Amino acid sequence: MEKQVRVRYAPSPTGHLHIGNARTALFNYLFARHQDGKFIIRIEDTDVKRNVAGGEESQLKYLKWLGMDWDEGVDVGGKYGPYRQTERLDIYKELYEDLLERGLAYKCYMTEEELEAEREGQIARGETPRYAGNHRNLTEEQIAQFEAEGRVPSIRFRVPDNREYKFNDIVKGDVTFHSNDFGDFVIVKKDGIPTYNFAVAVDDHLMEITHVLRGDDHISNTPKQMMIYEAFGWDTPQFGHMTLIVNESRKKLSKRDESIIQFIEQYEALGYLPEAIFNFIALLGWSPVGEEEIFSKDEFIKMFDAARLSKSPALFDSQKLKWMNNQYMKKQDLDTVVALSLPHLVKAGRVSEDLSEQEAAWVRDVIALYHEQMSYGAEIVELSEMFFKDHVDFEEEGKEVLKGEQVPEVLRAFAVELEALEEVEPATIKKAIKAVQKETGHKGKNLFMPIRVATTGQTHGPELPNAIALLGKEKVLKRIQKVIG
């Protein structure tokens, strides 16, 4: 009988949930759910100095926000716990002591200065820097001397000589590493905390992880973890290393790259929809059959096939994300769109936090004008700018429109019609524009464009009668007067 699929997402709380981490979590989630397997969250917090306050909370909160749930983890428990590495130190200790007893690991007393000098010497000689094994075979006298000096040892794994480590990667196919390319690596730091490679291998085995899906940057860790599996006589899981995510310059997405918004909480703050972000991330390095790009979470689960993970880097296209979020925005009811947009108008000082019923209805109507156009909630501030300014700034295209010979005649006639209106509503404004057409003989662009540019400052925008109705008679007449003088 085949083992039940068990996969894990194992973030370090050294930062908040970003696009790359979210993709790793999402592919593991889809892989597990597609095969009725288990999805586990494990917190790898052994790099204590780099852990940031709120890092773990951010990871869990925004995985949930994206629509993921898990079967075992720090917050839900499970029979393979604890699920936080700093709570598993006794487990690691028992195992690395076993390696020491069997001579498969040893204590290294070299200081940071000695290791750095060794490294610099290797680089100067054009060699690949790696630990040369100076403390691999210390005598008891040497150990006693180092102990007497008060040196604190790390523990290194004794890398086997002349060995090949091969595995069939889910994404890359056959991969081979040679043990001679690796120095003996540290498995326990001087502070007694195990290193990433040791703790991960131990946890993946004890938690019965069947598949390890992670980023390409981890591939050189795989042979080290395989050595640890081998030392204990454990079966290795199946590995899959997903390609990098690159920006539009084809450079690896870096957390320091400010041209791209990278943290999931930033997207929530900007008024993006979690379903759209889920959809977008699911297509970063994985593709379904066919041309369709918009899928629900359940559809992704049903069709997720790891064989379709891409071997090429995944391009992060910000414009594509905006387009995709817009597709989802169009499907939302107006209440949802208002809830995503209104806080941004408040934050920008456009409207008060404490709106009267009448003001709230007006703002709702303004937002409704841009429902189909809006890519994300915060965009309403820029889109609706004309409703909150006393004057309008004309674009070059708009200035050209206003140079037309017919413009003064059209605008004066429209001002007269508008002034006469008792009820300023889209329907009455349409009638007013028709009356101007009849009176002046101008129609089409020659009629509509001068009115649009003079009243809104834009050559393109929402339905003109609706926009004019929301701007109000007084503001529109002032703007027309400014143009015709």
Swiss-Prot record:
The keyword ATP-binding applies. GO terms for biological process: glutamyl-tRNA aminoacylation. Gene3D superfamilies: 1.10.10.350, HUPs. Transmembrane segments: none annotated. Its main location: cytoplasm. Its EC number is 6.1.1.17. It catalyses: tRNA(Glu) + L-glutamate + ATP = L-glutamyl-tRNA(Glu) + AMP + diphosphate. Catalyzes the attachment of glutamate to tRNA(Glu) in a two-step reaction: glutamate is first activated by ATP to form Glu-AMP and then transferred to the acceptor end of tRNA(Glu). This is Glutamate--tRNA ligase. It comes from Bacillus cytotoxicus (strain DSM 22905 / CIP 110041 / 391-98 / NVH 391-98). The lineage of its organism: Bacteria, Bacillati, Bacillota, Bacilli, Bacillales. The gene is gltX.
